[in-house]
């Protein structure tokens, strides 16, 4: 790639969105992804079966090669190694930045992840920006209009192809209608006053979709997707002031246990619900007790049993994995996930300076820098001649801000450092002090300004509790 012999082609905005998902929210999203995909579950009928969209995810470090060519418009055509490719931009569909592409000389249409042999997520349970179901359906329809008449084979990112024009068109039409149906029916009920949980409880997939395997909820789930549609238009809040500022789980758990007359009463009620097969109610009861007292082994064990039953009954692999991961962690504790900073390096090296500073900003411990301010000029000699060579990084009102292409003559300090070396520091391969003393970093002015910023950066939790406090 660096030698120019290979292009990395991506939709406009791809790198920005990758950074947002994998770095700014990376630690939290990565921890939650263990629940969505279940890679730490033992394989087998009582453990991990698959991920719904594919068999499994790898547990190695993440890497990223930045795109060398952005696609910016539908109808844009490139010839890659002698093969013509026509692109369709599909932003805010399965991902914020996405595209389909067509090989006109072969009649082959790739729908990326906009179509799969399963219902997809409108928002993954690991967390992400909520997807636009309406726009998603419209872009599938646009693909039918643009490419449908000339498509002889259709394939997607994860699953097997569809052969023949008629089969491909039928597949696209049903996928289009699935996302539009979820969107329209959710909002129909929302506009009658139903809240997200009520809508999820009442909507059922009609036979039109149940008759075909590729519109079943093996990955995404109607329960979760209807809530995603509601969230996109109406937020997490259901409009009831009782839910506007609810107590956190530990506080509400203790109050429910007290109201019930103690842990034994909660456990007794939970067992009755469990034996009756009322697993969702049983899980809610035991959740209050586990958060009120995570040392209560009887409560943890019963909640694990409940989660397992909920998992075994789930068609969606992500629901199953989440329930079974919760059960496993209630019995054995959550895993040691140390080394996260190093695993992020593969993505950091592809980031712009602005994106690097944005990732630093979300680590600033605001409570520690009250009343402090700082201005630091940055020069990156390995980016000489580019718009990223000079930067200003400032601390103001417990917040970091950055400005490209500017130095401030009143800055507290000016630092010259290679971008690659800054990444080494951020991933804890070395320190500012060591590199300054060895002459690899030069700093003029008040070096404590640098310490004011970088000495008050938080370290993201390598792992954190989910099913307990």
Where are these regions (language model features)?
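Alpha-helical segment of the N-proximal tetratricopeptide repeat
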Residues: 252-285
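Catalytic core of the metallo-beta-lactamase
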Residues: 51, 56-121, 126-134
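Active-site neighborhood of phospho(di)ester-bond hydrolases with catalytic His/Asp-centered motifs
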Residues: 1, 9-12, 90, 109-112, ...
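Divalent metal-coordination and catalytic microenvironments
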Residues: 8, 71, 101, 113, ...
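Divalent-metal (often Zn2+) His-rich catalytic cores of metallo-beta-lactamase-fold enzymes
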Residues: 118, 134-239, 302, 306-309
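Active-site HxH/HxHxD metal-binding segment of metal-dependent hydrolases
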Residues: 1-67, 71-73
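Feature captures hydrophobic
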Residues: 269, 278-284, 291, 295, ...
């Amino acid at each position: 790639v660096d030698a120019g012999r290979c292009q990395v082609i991506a939709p406009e905005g791809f790198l920005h969105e990758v950074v947002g998902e994998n770095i700014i929210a990376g630690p939290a999203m990565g921890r939650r992804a263990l629940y969505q995909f279940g890679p730490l579950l033992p394989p087998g009928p009582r453990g991990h079966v698959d991920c719904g969209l594919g068999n499994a995810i790898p547990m190695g470090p993440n890497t990223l090669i930045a795109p060398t060519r952005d696609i910016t418009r539908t109808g844009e055509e490139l010839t890659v190694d002698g093969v013509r490719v026509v692109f369709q931009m599909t932003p805010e569909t399965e991902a914020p930045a996405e595209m389909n592409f067509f090989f006109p000389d072969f009649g082959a249409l790739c729908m990326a992840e906009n179509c799969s042999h399963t219902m997809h997520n409108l928002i993954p349970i690991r967390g992400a920006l909520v997807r636009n179901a309406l726009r998603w359906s419209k872009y599938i329809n646009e693909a039918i209009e643009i490419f449908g008449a000339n498509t002889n084979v259709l394939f997607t990112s994860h699953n097997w192809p569809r052969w023949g024009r008629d089969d491909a068109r039928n597949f696209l039409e049903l996928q289009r209608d699935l996302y539009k149906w979820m969107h329209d029916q959710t909002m129909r009920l929302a506009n009658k006053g139903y809240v997200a949980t009520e809508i999820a409880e009442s909507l059922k997939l009609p036979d039109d979709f149940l008759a075909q395997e590729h519109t079943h909820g093996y990955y995404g789930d109607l329960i979760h997707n209807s809530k995603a549609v509601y969230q996109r238009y109406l937020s997490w809040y259901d409009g009831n002031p009782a839910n506007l500022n609810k107590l956190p789980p530990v506080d509400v758990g203790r109050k429910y246990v007290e109201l019930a007359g103690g842990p034994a009463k909660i456990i007794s009620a939970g067992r009755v619900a469990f034996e009756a097969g009322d697993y969702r109610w049983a899980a809610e009861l035991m959740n209050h007790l586990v958060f009120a007292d995570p040392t209560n082994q009887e409560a943890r064990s019963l909640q694990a049993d409940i989660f397992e039953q909920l998992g075994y009954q789930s068609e969606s692999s992500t629901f199953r994995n989440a329930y079974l991961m919760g059960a496993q962690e209630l019995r054995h504790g959550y895993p040691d996930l140390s080394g996260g900073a190093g695993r992020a390096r593969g993505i950091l090296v592809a980031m712009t300076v602005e994106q690097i500073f944005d990732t630093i900003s979300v680590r600033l411990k605001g409570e520690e820098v009250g009343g402090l301010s700082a201005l630091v000029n940055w020069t990156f000699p390995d980016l000489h001649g580019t718009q990223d060579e000079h930067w200003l990084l400032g601390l103001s009102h417990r917040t970091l801000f950055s400005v490209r292409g500017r130095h401030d003559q009143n800055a507290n300090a000016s630092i010259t450092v290679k971008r690659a070396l800054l990444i080494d520091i951020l991933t804890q391969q070395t320190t500012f002090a060591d590199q300054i003393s060895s002459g690899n970093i030069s700093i003029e002015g008040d070096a404590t300004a640098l310490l004011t910023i970088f000495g008050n950066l938080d370290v993201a939790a390598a792992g954190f509790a989910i099913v307990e406090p």
